[in-house]
Amino acid sequence: MSVVILDFGSQFTRLIARRFRELGAYSVILPGTASLERIGQENPQGIVLSGGPSSVYDERAPRPAPGVLELDVPILGVCYGMQFLAHEAGGDVKRAGKREYGKADLTRYGGQLFEGIQGEFVAWMSHSDSVTQLPAGYEVVAETEDTPVTAIENPVSRRYGVQFHPEVVHTPKGGQLLANFLKICDVKRDWTAAHIVEELIADVQHQVGDSGRVLLGISGGVDSSTLALLLARAVGERLTAVFIDHGLLRLGEREQVEAALRPLGVNLVTVDAREEFLGSLRGVSDPEQKRKIIGREFIRAFERETAKLGDFDFLAQGTLYPDVIESAGGHHGDKSGAANIKSHHNVGGLPEDLKFKLVEPFRTLFKDEVREIAQLLGLPDHIRMRHPFPGPGLAIRCLGEVTEEKLEILKRVDDIFISGLREFGLYDGCSQALAVLTPIQSVGVMGDERTYSYTVALRAVTTDDYMTAEWARLPYEFLATMSNRIVNQVHEVNRVVYDITGKPPATIEWE
């Protein structure tokens, strides 16, 4: 049982799915044009038609497959979805005289979607088309000053529409509205971390069988670490997790990963490949070349180690739902568990000729759901809530050639910055924070002596999706404290700068 979200190109479609799941209801995203058969495979109790950039009166506008609107389940249209419902039922949709974008107050609201909601209702608008004439059987249940038809419903056919985005944080009571839709759909709200873990373990045991051996590459991040714990519960000693220390990790990271996973029953093999990686990177300054070399060395190290460990039947990967969503802008990944191995962002790509079957337990989960599972499985918070860390590690935060000396400098600076964020209670408010060792050296004075030392850049950002990001407005006093600590504790550095560039135009990482 699920809520199926048909995606017509809205940037917020994933948020709809996440909001339903936060409310305890399993939801899936399919292309807006998904066939009736494909939708039926999800056994939907309700359907959502997402927003999108198209206009319903455009002949090229995407439309649900024939028969979707006739299904005997409640349907909620959001923005474009509402306009489509009205248009298909015989109503009129026209270009709005005034485009509405941003926050708007509902001047009145009611009906089943708004049941139990009281007080001011602020909605996030983003539309240039409007419903100008209602189809038969529908009634207006909400309006704003500029949009007389802001929400509609047909309680007999159980068709509902809103001309705003209930899924975004800018619509504070949107969660209550979505909860009301779930109530209308009579969805069982049992999508909890405990339920997910129980189902995933059963699925893995069914796929792997009683004797299958599973190989997993560990990066030290939350996804692969959580996957290791889940697989250990599912298949025990038949899991072998391989952690490759390439010398590009953060300070003490190898020891932290070993201390976190081994006591929880993970059969962990650590490979010391620092010499091979750093040797291959010697003399290389180009960022793309560094990435390629690291990817190649990962494959070599992984192949060397797996050759020692014997035969495996399955390769586990921490693929997440956003990687395989059947969206308007992409294609659905193969669900067959077939043998072609795709590159994993944490290990720089695995060889295509590894003839394993894939085990991807997290392919239906969002990142926040993995974190919830991690907590249930006992993963320590310092790993569970850790910021994203790139597969190439500190190599792409050490601008120019990577050397052991530079890495040691960067590790200490990074540790001071991240530890400081935790100490000041700022870490969880940042989506990602990092230090960059630049190739810039500048003149300074320490004591009575002239210095000519490195410049480091600190960067922290906030983001919901990592597609765009804002630089984090960290307090001046905190930044001053960090600068003081860094130049006093890391003598090879005499200048600290803070990156205040958003994404775009910059990327989060410097390389």
From Swiss-Prot:
GO terms for cellular component: cytosol. It is an enzyme of class 6 (ligase). One of its GO terms (molecular function) is ATP binding. Pathway: Purine metabolism; GMP biosynthesis; GMP from XMP (L-Gln route): step 1/1. Pfam families: GATase, GMP_synt_C, NAD_synthase. Residues 2-190 form the Glutamine amidotransferase type-1 domain. Its EC number is 6.3.5.2. The active site is at 79 (nucleophile), 165, 167. ATP binds at residues 219-225. It catalyses: XMP + L-glutamine + ATP + H2O = GMP + L-glutamate + AMP + diphosphate + 2 H(+). The keyword ATP-binding applies. Residues 191-386 form the GMPS ATP-PPase domain. Homodimer. Catalyzes the synthesis of GMP from XMP. This is GMP synthase [glutamine-hydrolyzing]. It comes from Deinococcus deserti (strain DSM 17065 / CIP 109153 / LMG 22923 / VCD115).
